[in-house]
């Protein structure tokens, strides 16, 4: 029985001393059984190193094996000794099973609990409580210890002690149950080491030798095992990163010193050995340096001195090429730089992939980019980041299944369920093929989004019907749509067949056991295990062993969770929400098994994980100020203050894990261990930005090192530039070389420069490569690509649009905004999929229809809206609105309580606007003549004629539309007609937009009205019609400000909010009668006109609202020219990608749904159609000049 320590800082070759000790023991004692104990994290690597060393001591044997030297972790040591004992045959229980035990205990002791009462419903509380109970057990703390703690605390009269006493009261109740319900029935992870401690007390270890390496501290359970080993084993050697032995408590350094943690461990072990009267051997200090380079040796010395706040006595090294700092613009650039350096060092220097170790404080930040990038660079890696099972489709299926039941077939839950691809309908030939299933599901989702099918719609008797509304096939169903209907209903019927019976059975389940059986039967009957087996087999066919193993791991865990649920909660009533939470927590804490696929690969891990320090090169990446040092928080139920109070009541062999403060104090030491992992080179790297991360800064640790050693900062370029002279770092693999070649070639073309010599050489070599020749030529040819659409041939344009273009004026507006977008929408008829929602178009249609019906009903009754009172108006409005929500296009307004509320708001807006017409009528002589006037619509009665233009070459254009309202005024036998256009948002007439074809609607409607006056009115012979103008009416239920009401009557404030805006003819007779209420000089609150002090009427200053007859005619003429110009360009196949860019930087691309298709990029030759900055006067001057020029011709 003896204890020996191997001590030294991290630069020394500790392992060599330990391995030599093995051979010494073997020489001294041929019967020696040697156990090499390392952290579980390092077991595989350590075992390889031990075997390699032992083999090297043999005489040229190709094969080597040994049974007397074993490498274990503490838990694996327990398996080795106890695998055949009764203890080890007891059923294992997962953490999820422990959650279930604690859940039951919380329910059963609800009346006894104080601060934990009702907490089981809080997300994460049960898992947090289980973690705390496990920590108590790992700390060797018993129920009786907790009771003693409570007694001690009750004698302290402080708020902290009182709160902790209450907390321990509840913990004690649950902890007692926790231990009793698992004792002898289950083997918990926290039971393994105590069982080993007990077992070893009766085991003959007189020929056993133990080496313990890789630890800086031990849990109380591990310490208990060591205590037994000290008393029963022949010899125990413990290796610590420590520069001196500490035998007296007074000799312990300050908690902030670098080696404090190791000092404390040494002291505890030393005292433990003395107490047990175990012989303590002289400390052994390795003399051989493991760290080979001066830079790293100096770094170790500096880090010790600076952390211990000692004078810095470190000589600066020359070029420091073995110690470097790299700055990258993004995390992706950072990983690419590392992959490139590794690839080149392996290719050009004497390195293997196994010589590299990559560490980062937070590997989660890189989890989505590491594997793809290293795969691109063909660098084999093992990412030591356990992947959680919570994201597996089986877990998604279970979650969605219970959500579908709880929330009654909601769209989100149904798609989540079906998209797991674990529930597949069966046909007479077997399961539906996955390709067919995906197509059917896509069509089903489209239909659901279009018509809002959810809830009971899934269970209805009648099939869903797929159809599309169109101008030519309204209400009909084509053969294609009939086929889609059948595909969609395959899935709907399948859901209707399997889910309602399952849900009914769950509702009838008497207890948890029955519910678990029902769930398991449902999954098996519907082929979920079969689908998982199919996934495994496909992965095996593709040679992906990692993915092949996962379906079985997940299913096995699910079965284990179900067994544990039945055992622990099966006799209780079944609560679906609690059951699902327990399952999800189980999967959340579960991870997939990971085994390195090859020995020669780069290991990627976190700086906090203990590493074998046998690598030549280490990259510490992601070294930012946010994570190095780490910002540690205590997430356990016992706070740091609680821990300090508790620890004072415990014996030396019982102790909790470190406080957050203690772990923060150990950060320099943990990072020191990471710094010292390599033998030769250490690289630090950090990004300045990441996904949703800006302003990242270098770690203060790295900053200290950089300043101490005057290290230069290497900036990693994500992409090469023409100016880069050193191109080697951009050609790590042929694929990356090609990718970077394309980037440089594109730059060369853009700058009109020749391709640099080195890149021409790379281009030549890639062309000579049989694998990359074709791809290289194809991609290089793409450099000449410009994203310029080709003009369509006239014959193709005619096939798309016909020889006669029957269209609305709004489509021409879209054409002038972007010719290519028009082609995509109306030529190729591309559209976004329909979604069941209340769009602005829907609300606009509701307003238009309601106002149209209101005015038509009044006209039918020969009543003027001006002459009725409020009660009569309300009666008419009720008649008009009644039943509108039953129309197919407005059925969404009945789909939910929210939509019914919106329906009331829509009705209120219609009421406001209708009454505004009444109030306006009190002040103006303008009266509604017709509403919803159609022109150019084939097959409609009483419609007006289309605006028709012959374009030549057999082409013609017919413009159709619908005028919201035509108003009329008759003054002294002079008739004026005007247009009113309803808008859901505020609109003003923009002369520039009208000139460039971006606002054609109002002028086109005015033209259509003027050309159809004979169909609108019974005119007397020679009677002339004057255009009153064209105005917008903003349909709104305005919010009135209090200050406005205080200054003016409420009715006037409302009128101002509903004031017309647009163009009005400069005619004094007309203007003076548009608002007869203006007595003094001032603005009208009905129309955009003003009465001036001299009595004449005109427009509001600089508004352009009032227009002369001649200028109006010029606008109408320009409008007709634009329509013909657009139609000619369309027939000529013009599909230019020329989105308009207004002077205020708005563009036609801003809200376009076709941006992904257009791929607009000014670097690829695309250009905006930039409008000049012009005002109303500029446009009118242009029109006059153009008209004058035409007159002269």
UniProtKB/Swiss-Prot annotation:
GO biological process, one term: double-strand break repair via homologous recombination
Necessary cofactors: Mg(2+)
Assigned keywords, A-Z: ATP-binding, DNA damage, DNA repair, DNA-binding, Exonuclease, Helicase, Hydrolase, Nuclease, Nucleotide-binding
Disulfide bonds, paired cysteine numbers: none
Keyword Ribonucleoprotein recorded: no
Enzyme class: hydrolase
Entry keyword Nuclease: yes
Domain of life: Bacteria
Subunit comment: Heterodimer of AddA and RexB.
Similarity comment: Belongs to the helicase family. AddB/RexB type 2 subfamily.
Additional notes on this entry: Despite having helicase-like domains, this subunit does not have helicase activity.
Cross-referenced PANTHER family: RECBCD ENZYME SUBUNIT RECC (PTHR30591:SF1)
Protein name: ATP-dependent helicase/deoxyribonuclease subunit B
Taxonomic placement: Bacteria, Bacillati, Bacillota, Bacilli, Lactobacillales
Gene name, Swiss-Prot/TrEMBL: rexB
């Amino acid at each position: 029985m003896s204890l020996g320590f191997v001590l030294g800082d991290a630069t020394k070759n500790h392992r060599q001393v330990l391995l030599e000790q093995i051979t010494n023991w073997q020489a001294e004692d041929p019967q020696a059984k040697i156990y090499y104990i390392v952290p579980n994290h390092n077991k595989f690597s350590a075992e390889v190193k031990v075997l390699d060393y032992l083999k090297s001591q043999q005489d040229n044997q190709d094969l080597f094996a040994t049974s007397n030297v074993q490498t274990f972790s503490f838990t694996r040591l327990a398996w080795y000794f106890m695998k055949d004992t009764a203890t080890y045959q007891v059923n294992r229980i997962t953490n999820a099973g422990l959650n279930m035990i604690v859940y039951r205990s919380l329910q059963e002791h609800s009346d006894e609990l104080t601060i934990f009462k009702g907490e089981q419903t809080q997300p994460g509380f049960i898992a947090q409580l289980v973690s705390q109970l496990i920590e108590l057990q790992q700390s060797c703390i018993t129920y009786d210890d907790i009771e003693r703690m409570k007694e001690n605390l009750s004698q302290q009269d402080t708020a902290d002690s009182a709160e902790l006493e209450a907390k321990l009261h509840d913990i004690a109740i649950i902890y007692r149950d926790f231990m009793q319900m698992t004792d002898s029935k289950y083997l918990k992870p926290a039971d393994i080491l105590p069982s080993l401690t007990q077992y070893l007390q009766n085991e003959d270890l007189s020929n056993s030798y133990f080496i313990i390496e890789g630890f800086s501290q031990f849990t109380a359970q591990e310490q208990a095992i060591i205590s037994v080993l000290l008393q029963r084993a022949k010899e125990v050697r413990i290796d610590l990163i420590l520069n001196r032995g500490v035998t007296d408590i007074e000799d312990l350094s300050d908690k902030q010193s670098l080696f404090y943690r190791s000092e404390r461990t040494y002291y505890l072990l030393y005292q433990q050995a003395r107490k047990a009267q175990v012989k303590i051997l002289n400390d052994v200090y390795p003399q051989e340096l493991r760290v080979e380079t001066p830079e790293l040796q100096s770094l170790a010395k500096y880090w010790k001195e600076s952390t211990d706040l000692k004078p810095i006595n470190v000589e600066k090294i020359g070029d420091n090429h073995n110690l470097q700092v790299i700055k990258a613009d993004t995390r992706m650039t950072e990983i690419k730089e590392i992959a490139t350096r590794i690839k080149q060092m392996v290719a050009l220097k004497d390195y293997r992939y196994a010589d590299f170790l990559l560490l980062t404080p937070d590997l989660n930040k890189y989890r989505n980019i590491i594997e793809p990038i290293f795969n691109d660079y063909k660098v084999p890696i093992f990412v030591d980041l356990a992947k959680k099972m919570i994201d597996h489709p089986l877990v998604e299926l279970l979650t969605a299944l219970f959500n579908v039941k709880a929330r009654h077939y909601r769209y989100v839950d149904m798609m989540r369920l079906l998209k797991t691809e674990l529930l597949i309908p069966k046909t007479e030939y077997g399961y539906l093929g996955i390709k067919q299933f995906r197509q059917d599901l896509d069509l089903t989702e489209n239909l659901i989004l279009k018509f809002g099918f959810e809830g009971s719609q899934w269970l209805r008797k009648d099939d869903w019907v797929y159809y599309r509304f169109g101008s030519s096939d309204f209400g009909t169903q084509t053969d294609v749509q009939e086929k889609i209907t059948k595909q969609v209903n395959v899935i709907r019927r399948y859901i209707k067949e399997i889910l309602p019976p399952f849900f009914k059975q769950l509702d009838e389940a008497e207890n948890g056991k029955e519910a678990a059986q029902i769930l398991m039967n449902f999954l098996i009957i519907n082929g979920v295990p079969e689908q998982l087996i199919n996934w495994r087999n496909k992965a095996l066919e593709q040679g992906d062993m990692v993915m092949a193993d996962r379906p079985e791991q997940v299913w096995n865990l699910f079965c284990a969770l179900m067994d544990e649920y039945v055992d622990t909660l099966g006799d209780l009533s079944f609560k679906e929400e609690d059951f699902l939470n327990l399952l999800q927590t189980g999967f959340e804490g579960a991870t997939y098994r990971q085994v390195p696929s090859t020995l020669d690969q780069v290991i990627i891990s976190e700086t906090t994980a203990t590493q074998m320090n046998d690598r030549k090169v280490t990259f510490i990446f992601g070294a930012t100020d946010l994570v190095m040092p780490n910002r540690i928080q205590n997430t356990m139920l016992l706070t740091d203050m609680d821990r300090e109070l508790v620890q004072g009541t415990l014996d030396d062999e019982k102790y909790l894990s470190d406080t957050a403060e203690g772990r923060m104090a150990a950060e320099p030491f943990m990072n020191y261990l990471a710094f010292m992992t390599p033998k030769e080179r250490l690289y630090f790297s950090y990004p300045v930005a990441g996904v949703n991360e800006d302003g990242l800064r270098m770690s203060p640790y790295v900053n200290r090192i950089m300043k101490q050693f005057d290290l230069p900062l290497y900036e990693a370029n994500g992409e090469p530039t023409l100016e880069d002279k050193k191109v080697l770092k951009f050609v790590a693999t042929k694929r990356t070389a090609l990718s970077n070649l394309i980037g440089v070639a594109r730059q060369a073309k853009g700058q009109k420069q020749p391709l640099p010599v080195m890149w021409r050489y790379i281009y030549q070599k890639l062309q000579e490569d049989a694998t990359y020749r074709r791809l290289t030529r194809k991609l290089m040819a793409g450099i000449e690509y410009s994203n310029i659409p080709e003009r369509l041939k006239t014959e193709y344009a005619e096939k798309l649009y016909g020889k006669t273009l029957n269209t609305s004026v709004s489509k021409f507006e879209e054409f002038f905004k972007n010719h290519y977008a028009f082609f995509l929408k109306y030529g190729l008829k591309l559209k976004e999929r329909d979604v069941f929602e209340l769009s602005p178009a829907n609300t606009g249609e509701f307003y238009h229809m309601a106002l149209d019906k209101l005015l038509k009903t009044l006209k039918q009754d020969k009543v003027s809206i001006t002459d009725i009172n409020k009660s009569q108006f309300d009666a008419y409005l009720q008649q008009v609105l009644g039943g509108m929500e039953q129309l197919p296009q407005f059925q969404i307004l009945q789909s939910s309580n929210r939509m019914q509320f919106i329906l009331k708001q829509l009705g209120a807006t219609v009421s406001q606007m209708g009454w505004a017409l009444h109030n306006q009528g009190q002040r103006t002589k303008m009266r509604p003549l017709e509403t919803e006037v159609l022109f150019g619509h084939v097959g409609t009665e009483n419609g007006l004629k289309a605006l028709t233009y012959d374009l030549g070459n057999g082409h013609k254009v017919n413009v159709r539309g619908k005028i919201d309202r035509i108003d009329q005024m008759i003054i002294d036998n002079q008739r004026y007609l005007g247009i009113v256009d309803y808008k859901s948002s505020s609109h003003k007439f923009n002369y520039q937009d009208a000139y460039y074809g971006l606002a054609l609607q109002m002028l086109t409607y005015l033209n259509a009205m003027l050309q159809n006056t004979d169909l609108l009115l019974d005119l007397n012979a020679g009677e002339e019609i004057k255009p009153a103008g064209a105005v917008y009416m903003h349909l709104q239920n305005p919010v009135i400000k209090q200050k406005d009401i205080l200054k003016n009557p409420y009715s006037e404030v409302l009128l101002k909010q509903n004031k017309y805006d647009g163009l009005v003819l400069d005619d004094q007779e007309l203007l003076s009668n548009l608002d007869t209420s203006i007595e003094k000089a001032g603005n009208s609150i009905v129309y955009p006109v003003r009465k001036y002090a001299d009595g004449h009427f005109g427009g509001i200053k600089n508004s352009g609202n009032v227009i002369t007859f001649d200028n109006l005619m010029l606008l109408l003429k320009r409008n007709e020219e634009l329509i013909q110009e657009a139609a000619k360009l369309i027939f000529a196949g013009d599909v230019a990608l020329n989105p308009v860019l207004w002077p205020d930087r708005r563009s036609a691309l801003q809200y376009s749904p076709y941006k992904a298709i257009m791929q607009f990029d000014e670097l690829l030759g695309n250009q905006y159609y930039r409008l000049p900055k012009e005002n109303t006067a500029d446009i009118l001057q242009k029109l006059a000049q153009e008209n004058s020029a035409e007159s002269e011709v």
